[in-house]
């Protein structure tokens, strides 16, 4: 009988209204910064810097994708590059965690709001051996993804999630 499999956290990335990259986001949290601001109708919102996202997407050649797809592809592209892991490997699984999806397209292109479609687009872009696992359960999505990823690795089903 073997012992429990140790799961290591590898390269990561995050983009939020607080910043681009894990270090920038965590520095903002430690500094107790908020990106909450009034929008055109005084509704408080947190928005990702679209100019920075556009520049990042342009660097990676992501024209033709929705804003959410560009965000996911740009973020995951950096992680894949730094990790040395290829999503085409059968022992690799992409987990896509999101709270809302492409809600900006609800009025104009509702079919692009389907998170299952987003997961398929991400998988195709990276030539993934498996369709990405989609986790979308409000603000806990990211933590749920980490827990599920660790369980999938410990089960022996995947080496990298």
Model-flagged regions — what are they?
Residues 1-132, 137, 151-154:
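Conserved "HGTGT" condensation-loop signature of ketosynthase/thiolase-family condensing enzymes
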Residues 146, 150:
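Short, conserved alpha-helix that lines the donor NDP-sugar binding/gating region
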Residues 142:
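Short conserved active-site loop signatures built around small residues
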């Amino acid at each position: 009988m073997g012992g429990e499999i140790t799961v290591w956290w590898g390269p990561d990335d995050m983009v939020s209204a607080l910043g681009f990259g894990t270090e920038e986001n965590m520095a903002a949290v430690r500094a107790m910064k908020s990106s909450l601001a009034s929008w055109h109708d005084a509704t408080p919102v947190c928005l990702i810097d679209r100019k920075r996202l556009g520049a990042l997407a342009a660097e990676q050649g992501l024209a033709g994708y929705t804003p959410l797809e560009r965000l996911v592809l740009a973020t995951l592209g950096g992680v894949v590059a730094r990790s040395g892991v290829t999503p085409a490997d059968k022992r690799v699984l992409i987990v896509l965690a999101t709270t809302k999806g492409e809600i900006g397209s609800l009025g104009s292109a509702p079919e692009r709001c389907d998170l299952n479609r987003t997961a398929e687009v991400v998988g195709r872009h990276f030539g993934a051996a498996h369709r990405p696992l989609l986790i979308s359960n409000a603000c806990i999505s990211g933590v749920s993804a980490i827990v599920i990823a660790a369980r999938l690795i410990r089960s022996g089903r995947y080496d990298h999630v």
